[in-house]
């Protein structure tokens, strides 16, 4: 048990009485597989059918068998980024745990529902959000609305890892509609409000993109935290390490700070 909303409201009021701000964790790249949206999405005829990234098995393969995944993307947590669902007869994308299916932000109804939820919390009096992996919400699609690797001629996309899967981050991080989605979120949720703060967890974002996204003129996010420095002792994966050099750490942190010095 995590308490009641009455407990939360009492905590929020007490925090504000002591001039403390309450910033909520916000996870909208994905939901739980137990969420009502996802459970409804398992039915192809439900209005929520396109709220997640559902794809059929690769042509010529038996659904649910090894190698039948729509493409060879790997999950951040290991294994395939695709999980077969027997009820729907298709696979859903999960960049993280199979318990965390990715929302389809290309669907305007998804965005509308997310913004509605965010407004509910803001109206309750919270002071902003820490946005989990928010830079992964826009995926790169081809001209036919397909994700990379969905056709046989693209089986070799990306460098293969030890498990036989490719890194999905080049296709899911800082996608082509990220700025559009963040600016829309700003308009729909935060426009006209004062005294709030937003910070985004930003895998795959360069210092230059950090400067753009946090520029007040672009009306996206207030702050980001990056990960360039996390991998300076890694080569390809966190399990493949290289000697740590403090100069590399200084250079990485300096580049991040220099980009937003103004």
Q: Where in the sequence are the language-model features?
A:
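Noncatalytic carbohydrate-binding groove/subsite architecture in carbohydrate-active enzymes
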Residues: 194, 202-262
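Hydrophobic residues within beta-strands of alpha/beta enzymes
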Residues: 129-131
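Acidic/aromatic-lined carbohydrate-recognition and catalytic surfaces
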Residues: 1-119, 123, 136-206
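Conserved nucleotide-binding/hydrolysis micro-motifs of P-loop NTPases
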Residues: 135-136, 252
């Amino acid at each position: 048990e995590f308490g009641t909303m009455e407990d939360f409201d009492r905590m929020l009021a007490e925090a504000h009485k002591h001039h403390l701000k309450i910033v909520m964790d916000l996870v909208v790249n994905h939901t739980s597989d137990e969420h009502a949206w996802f459970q409804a999405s398992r039915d192809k005829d439900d209005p929520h059918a396109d709220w997640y990234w559902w794809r059929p098995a690769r042509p010529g393969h038996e659904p649910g068998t090894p190698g039948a995944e729509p493409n060879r993307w790997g999950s951040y947590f290991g294994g395939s980024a695709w999980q077969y669902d027997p009820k729907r007869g298709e696979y859903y994308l999960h960049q993280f745990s199979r318990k965390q299916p990715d929302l389809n932000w290309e669907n305007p109804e998804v965005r509308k529902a997310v913004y509605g939820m965010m407004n509910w919390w803001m109206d309750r009096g919270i002071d902003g959000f820490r946005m989990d992996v928010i830079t992964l919400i826009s995926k790169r699609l081809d001209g036919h609305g397909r994700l990379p690797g969905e056709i046989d001629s693209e089986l070799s996309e990306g460098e293969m890892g030890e498990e036989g899967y490719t890194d999905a981050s080049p296709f899911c991080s800082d996608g082509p509609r990220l700025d559009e989605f963040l600016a829309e979120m700003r308009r729909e949720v935060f426009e006209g409000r004062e005294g709030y703060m937003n910070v985004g967890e930003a895998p795959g974002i360069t210092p230059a993109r950090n400067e753009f996204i946090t520029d007040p003129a672009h009306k996206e996010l207030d702050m980001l935290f990056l990960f360039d420095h996390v991998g300076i002792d890694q080569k390809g994966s966190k399990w493949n390490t290289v000697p740590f050099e403090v100069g590399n750490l200084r250079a990485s942190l300096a580049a991040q700070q220099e980009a937003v010095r103004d």
